[in-house]
Amino acid sequence: KIAAYFPDGATEEYRLRIAQAAGGTMRPVVSGMAWVDLLPQDCDKGTALAVLQRHLHINREETMAFGDNENDVELLRQAGLSYAMKTGNPCVLRLADRAADDVISELNMLLSELE
């Protein structure tokens, strides 16, 4: 991946300009307030999670993921249980199964339910 930093914010205009410059060979996604990631068309966090699931012989239902921005969309889709950070991008909040204040608190709550 290539990460581009825009001090004045990662606007849709910047994302579209990067997409045009990439000529369809790569895909720009917003990854933070001031960041745009440029990814290969066939590779993202969801692809990486799928490889890890196969390697560990676990299925989607045995996987959970946390995300907060556009670069996490495929990751959340690949996980059996997906969490968006409450302060995250609205598109991620709509996609996720649940919303969380922070990862550690959510994991502690889930672990306490198992005891």
Regions picked out by a protein language model, each given a short descriptive name:
Residues 1-66, 70, 75:
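Conserved acidic, metal-coordinating active-site core of Asp-based
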Residues 78, 82-115:
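Asp-based, Mg2+/Mn2+-dependent phosphohydrolase catalytic module
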